[in-house]
Regions:
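Acidic, low-complexity, intrinsically disordered peripheral segments
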Residues: 40-44, 49, 104-106, 110, ...
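Regulatory alphaC helix of protein kinase catalytic domains
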Residues: 46-60
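Sec/SRP-type N-terminal targeting helices
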Residues: 72-76, 89-90, 145-151, 162-190, ...
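Periplasmic alpha-helical coiled-coil/stalk elements that build and connect Gram-negative outer-membrane
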Residues: 55, 85, 184, 188-302, ...
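A small-residue-enriched
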Residues: 62-163, 272, 276, 300-367, ...
């Protein structure tokens, strides 16, 4: 987008072929004046803001990975799910617990001796002893008995599930599948961050190129203005032509300032992505491979094997399968081994086996089973759609890469023609057969071609990054940067004098 704006601005700079061609002597003086003006422009000190941080592409990737809160949050979620799955690994083993109790008590009762007579009279019958006991008991008073104290006890108990019908294995599998889903989300977050970094990194590079070309166009317009002023003094052009040159210079300066502002904004956006406290200057240039990338089938295979979206869908299906297995397990008998022992000098203990089987429940378990089967079906259909969408995205990006490569290669002929025209214009100006304004026109058009070429290189880089992102291998772009057929477009590139 930035280069498109610059290209439009470049094309708006008028070049005036109708001006009168100067004599050879005047042409030489004009060339000297242009050189002095260009030198003065180059030596003019500019405002020095915060010193930018220079980062290559790999360094920017590493910083972005370290500084991204979103990626850190995804990693924390994945770690949490992993800890949950690890915690459930021992599910189904024995559980042992210890219990203890301390109690303070107070007991009180009233005893009536006369109440004991009926039980003893039955044994003695009508003997004189029985009559004597009855007479004695009637004279005894009742009395109160009270007792208080503290008692304590401890016990140890154990429970061991012997058979759960697969419910425990289903719970463990569900936790493992949730961990896989969280890992897929983390990988997807990392891939998205890599794609964002790639877009902002090379956007900043493109903006720097555009700013350089726009600044060069402003210097060319300055030469134009200086030449027009000299020609007006010599009386070879009209005042209106001089006014047009001044207007073109002001327009070029304004456009150069806007392009520089765009470049600074792109550098700030890149700095935010990598977590830097100052603007970032990218050092890895835009590039285009002169040879085609691997065949389309190669990227299809990579996407099917490594795309995190497919890994997440697979984890969702596994979750549905494990939930279905757990529900089915709960429909069968549950067998537990139990044991308990009192911890005393002469402990009491008990051990046994408990069996539980729910024959009827208020919950319709058949409907729940069908629901989990529908979840599995949904995951299968989602996987099929995701594979189709990913293949379409891969093919679209692969074709975009190849189209950008072809356009870039075709531009070499245009640049060669422009360079040849510049050579002829310079030679004509030295020999007095051409005008300085014709040379400026050729330089302006060549700068526009270089801008368009840089824009195509940016489109190629972004298409390649999109292809690798769709294939689940976003960091492989560094491998393509190292290929021997890579052609680099740097901000310092300028037309040959």
């Amino acid at each position: 987008m930035l280069v498109t704006r610059v290209a439009q601005r470049l094309s708006s700079t008028a070049v005036f072929e109708a001006m009168i061609r100067p004599t050879p002597a005047l042409a030489a003086s004009l060339l000297l004046g242009c050189a002095l003006a260009a030198t003065a422009a180059d030596l003019t000190p500019g405002a020095t803001a915060t010193t930018p941080l220079t980062l290559d592409y790999l360094g920017a990737l590493d910083r972005a990975q370290q500084q991204s809160p979103k990626l850190a949050a995804a990693r924390a979620a994945a770690d949490g799910r992993a800890l949950q799955a690890e915690a459930l690994r021992g599910l189904g083993g024995p559980s042992v617990s210890v219990g203890a109790a301390v109690a303070r008590y107070r007991l009180g009762t009233s005893i009536d001796p006369g109440a004991l007579l009926p039980s003893s009279s039955g044994l003695l019958g009508n003997s004189p002893l029985a009559a004597g006991l009855a007479s004695a008991a009637s004279r005894l008073p009742s009395f109160e008995v009270e007792q208080s104290g503290t008692r304590s006890g401890a016990s140890v108990s154990a429970v061991w599930p012997l058979y759960t019908g697969g419910a425990i294995q289903g719970a463990q599998g569900l936790a493992a599948a949730r961990r896989q889903e969280a890992e897929a989300d983390w990988l997807a977050a990392g891939d998205d961050l890599d794609a964002l970094l790639t877009e902002r990194y090379f956007s900043a590079q493109l903006a720097a190129i555009a700013a350089g070309l726009r600044a060069q166009a402003a210097r060319t317009a300055g030469e134009h203005d200086h030449a027009a002023a000299r020609m007006l003094q010599e009386g070879v052009i009209a005042p209106v032509d001089r006014l047009q040159a001044s207007t073109a210079l002001r327009d070029a300066q304004r456009q150069a300032s806007a392009a520089q502002s765009d470049a600074e904004l792109a550098a700030v956006a890149l700095a935010r992505t990598v977590g830097a406290g100052q603007p970032v200057r990218p050092s890895t240039p835009l590039f285009v491979l002169t040879q085609p990338v691997e065949p389309l089938a190669h990227f299809f295979d990579l996407a099917m094997a490594h795309h995190p979206g497919l890994a997440k869908v697979a984890a969702k299906r596994t979750q549905a399968e494990q939930l279905h297995a757990a529900q089915q397990g709960l429909r069968g008998p549950q067998v537990l081994a139990l044991a308990s022992s009192q911890l005393r000098d002469r402990p009491n203990w008990a051990a046994g086996v408990a069996v539980s089987w729910t024959l009827w429940s208020s919950i319709d378990r058949d409907q729940l089973s069908r629901a989990t089967l529908k979840d599995i079906e949904q995951a299968d259909l989602t996987d099929a759609q995701a594979r189709s969408d990913i293949q379409l995205l891969v093919e679209r990006q692969w074709r975009a890469v190849d189209n950008a490569r072809r356009q870039f290669m075709a531009f070499d002929a245009h640049l060669a023609e422009g360079d040849e025209l510049l050579r002829l214009r310079r030679a004509g100006l030295r020999e007095g057969t051409s005008t300085a304004l014709a040379l400026i026109d050729a330089e302006t058009r060549q700068a526009q071609r270089r801008t368009e070429r840089a824009q195509i290189a940016y489109q190629y880089t972004q298409a390649l990054a999109g292809l690798l992102h769709a294939s689940g291998q976003p960091r492989d772009i560094t491998r393509y940067l190292a290929r021997p057929d890579a052609v680099f477009i740097k901000p310092t590139d300028a037309p040959a004098p």
